[in-house]
From Swiss-Prot:
Keyword Ribosomal protein: no
Gene: Armt1
InterPro entries on file: ARMT-1-like_metal-bd_sf, ARMT1, ARMT1-like_metal-bd
Function: Metal-dependent phosphatase that shows phosphatase activity against several substrates, including fructose-1-phosphate and fructose-6-phosphate. Its preference for fructose-1-phosphate, a strong glycating agent that causes DNA damage rather than a canonical yeast metabolite, suggests a damage-control function in hexose phosphate metabolism. Has also been shown to have O-methyltransferase activity that methylates glutamate residues of target proteins to form gamma-glutamyl methyl ester residues. Possibly methylates PCNA, suggesting it is involved in the DNA damage response.
Record family assignment: Belongs to the damage-control phosphatase family. Sugar phosphate phosphatase III subfamily.
The UniProt record lists the keyword S-adenosyl-L-methionine: yes
Chain positions found as N-acetylalanine: 2
Catalytic activity: beta-D-fructose 1-phosphate + H2O = D-fructose + phosphate; beta-D-fructose 6-phosphate = dihydroxyacetone + D-glyceraldehyde 3-phosphate; L-glutamyl-[protein] + S-adenosyl-L-methionine = [protein]-L-glutamate 5-O-methyl ester + S-adenosyl-L-homocysteine
Residues engaged in binding Mn(2+): 251-252, 289
Pfam family, one: ARMT1-like_dom
Cited PANTHER family: DAMAGE-CONTROL PHOSPHATASE ARMT1 (PTHR12260:SF6)
Residues the record lists as N6-acetyllysine modifications: 40
This protein's name: Damage-control phosphatase ARMT1
Amino acid sequence: MAESPAFLSAQDVGSFAYLTIKDRTPQILTKVIDTLHRHKSEFFEKHGEEGVEAEKKAISLLSKLRNELQTDKPIIPLVDKCVDTDIWNQYLEYQRSLLNEGDGEPRWFFSPWLFVECYMYRRIHEAIMQSPPIHDFDVFKESKDENFFESQDSINALCTHLLQLKPITDLGEKQIQDEFFKLLQISLWGNKCDLSLSGGESSSQKADIINSLKDLKPFILVNETESLWALLSKLKKTAEPPAVRVDIVLDNSGFELVTDLVFADFLLSSELATEIHFHGKIIPWFVSDVTVRDFEWIVEHMKGSHLESMSACGAAWEAYVGMKKWVYHDHAFWTLPHPFCAMPQVAPDLYAELQKAGVVLFKGDLNYRKLMGDRKWKFTVPFHQALSGFHPAPLCSIRTLKCELQVGLQPGQAEHLTASDPHWLTTGKYGIFQFDGPL
């Protein structure tokens, strides 16, 4: 097999990876420090002087981290005692082993971008963990919750649309298929709401996304949703016993999570699936990623909404969780720096879990980077090849483009895009559905 290309890294001055490490990550760290400052009185109320001291300690550790990053210091081992600490430090050793003699140590602007960016979020977690009694404070909670509240109109419109379709089994197959594609596209464009891309600034969904779908269609660069529909339709007819499990590896909380839950509800209600398994992060991650607290918080706030459609959806979703038709999982692997092709070795239990699915949907850009190994693949390399052997089950990536990595395009397609829109890879304006079917 041909050798895999080099990793994306901030060594390439002017690249998106370089600008992320140079500008966006320090901006995110500054915002985290500011968040801690603003909660000082809350920490004092809850924990007295000890809470204030903890806040000072966390800020001091985060300021040190920001300085290390901005001055391109060597990457240092983690010192906390978490379930993943040893795996992280082994991975740092592995990165060190890849360097040539004159390269020195792994560094922020030199080592693979995926590694150093994940490492930064893991160090944020370490700083909080080392500062009891505020060690369970989610520094990103505020911005995630804000995104949900600012997107109320869009969420309500989406829930109203879903409820108007019910009972979905009464619809004809063609209408179910049309709605399947529509709700998939809504889940795709929900992925635009990414707080790590906006440096933690507001990125809520205020427009009515349902009525925008027609205008957004030309921005889907690869659309393999027909293959996904064909697979689910076939599974529905042939599954023995009649059980179809769909797994969704989540990305952002807030509006995007609601679009994923609406799609999951549709899959159950249309009997295209009998159970949905969601996969989230065990720690706050990449500003807006879903943790179990976010998942439960969204369902609870939907149910408690004064808006009827939202409240009805929230109640239905709570019931799905209660009946185990919706199951939430988290696993330390999702917040490691490893590409997904390493999952069978690093997290065989998680790989075995995904193998139980009829299909696995991977939401968002970070999951795409990990699926592709965050390498400088040519634009025309087939999606299956770039997965480097990762195939626990048929899978589909649903992602808006937010980094300089894209495979599976037609010859000339990337060049045409570059000519018309030089930043097409990084703005979240374009999207893809890429499918890797049954082997």
